[in-house]
A protein has these predicted regions:
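ABC family nucleotide-binding domain
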Residues: 1-207, 214
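Conserved beta-strand-loop-alpha-helix hinge in the C-terminal portion
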Residues: 218-238
Length: 238
C-alpha cells in the first residue's frame, strides 16, 4: 500500500517558493494501477519522487507498506529503491556497450546477487516483456518500443512490489505507446505489482484503474475507471 497523509512539498524560499505538492492525501492499495495526470508543473513527477524517497516532504507523511519514507536513513531509502521499487522513465537509460541481457541484469550484479540467480531472474524478466529472443542484442539494434520494454525488464528483474512509471510513452509513437501500455497493464494483472503511472495523455491514463488529476499540486479530480481487462466493450474501444 502507498499512502499520502496531507503531504506538501515546497521548493525554494521567499519570493521564489513553488508549492509542487499541496496537502495531498490518497491511499493506493497493493496491486493497484493508478495514473496521475495534469498540466506541466502540476506535481505529478514530484509525487513519484516522494514515494521513492528521492526528495523529502515539507510536511505530511509518505507511507510505503506502512513505513514512513521520510523517516528512513539514506541507506534505508536506497535499499527501498534498489529492492522494492522499479522505475521506468521516458528516457531508456540503457548502456549501449552491454547486451540486452547484461542491461537487465545490471541492478542485480550491483547488488551482489550470485550469478545463477541473476541469470534466472533475467530470463524471467525478458520473457515477461517478450524479448527473450533479443537477449544477445545491443540496445542500438532494438527499436524504440523494444528499448522501452527492455527498460521495463530491468525494472522488473528486482521483483519489485511497486513500479513507478514517469511518462514511459514519451519517446514512443502512438502505436508503440499503446503496445507498451498493454504490456504494463498485463504485467500488473499477472504479477500483482503496484503501478503508479505519470502521464499527460488521457488516452494512456485510461489504462489505469484509477486516475488522479493534479492541479497546482492539489487533487483536482479523482476518477475510478472500469478495469478494461474485464470489460470487453472498453477493451475493444481501446
Amino acid at each position: 500500500m502507498i499512502a499520502f497523509r496531507h503531504v506538501s512539498k515546497v521548493f525554494g524560499s521567499g519570493d521564489t517558493v513553488v508549492r509542487a505538492v499541496d496537502n495531498l492525501s490518497f491511499e493506493c492499495p497493493a496491486g493497484g494501477f493508478w495514473a496521475f495526470t495534469g498540466p506541466s508543473g502540476s506535481g505529478k513527477s514530484t509525487v513519484l519522487h516522494l514515494i521513492a524517497g528521492l526528495t523529502p516532504p515539507t510536511s505530511g507523511r509518505v507511507l510505503v507498506d506502512g513505513a514512513d519514507v521520510a523517516g528512513m536513513t539514506a541507506a534505508e531509502s536506497a535499499a527501498l529503491r534498489r529492492r522494492r521499487i522499479g522505475y521506468i522513465l521516458q528516457s531508456f537509460n540503457l548502456l549501449p556497450f552491454l547486451t540486452a541481457r547484461e542491461n537487465v541484469g545490471m541492478p542485480l550484479v550491483l547488488d551482489g546477487v550470485r550469478q545463477a540467480e541473476v541469470d534466472a531472474r533475467v530470463n524471467d524478466a525478458l520473457a515477461l516483456v517478450n524479448l527473450a529472443h533479443r537477449a544477445g542484442h545491443h540496445p542500438t539494434h532494438l527499436s524504440g518500443g523494444e528499448q522501452q520494454r527492455l527498460a521495463i525488464a530491468r525494472a522488473l528483474v528486482i521483483r519489485p512490489a511497486i513500479i513507478l512509471a514517469d511518462e514511459p510513452t514519451g519517446n514512443l509513437d502512438r502505436h508503440a505507446g499503446r503496445q507498451l501500455m498493454d504490456l504494463i497493464g498485463d504485467i500488473n494483472e499477472r504479477t500483482g505489482v503496484t503501478v503508479l503511472l505519470v502521464t499527460h495523455d488521457p488516452v494512456f491514463a485510461a489504462y489505469a484503474h484509477r486516475v488522479l488529476r493534479l492541479v497546482d499540486g492539489a487533487l483536482g479530480q479523482d476518477m475510478a475507471l472500469v478495469d478494461k481487462r474485464r470489460d470487453p466493450a472498453r477493451a475493444a474501444a481501446r
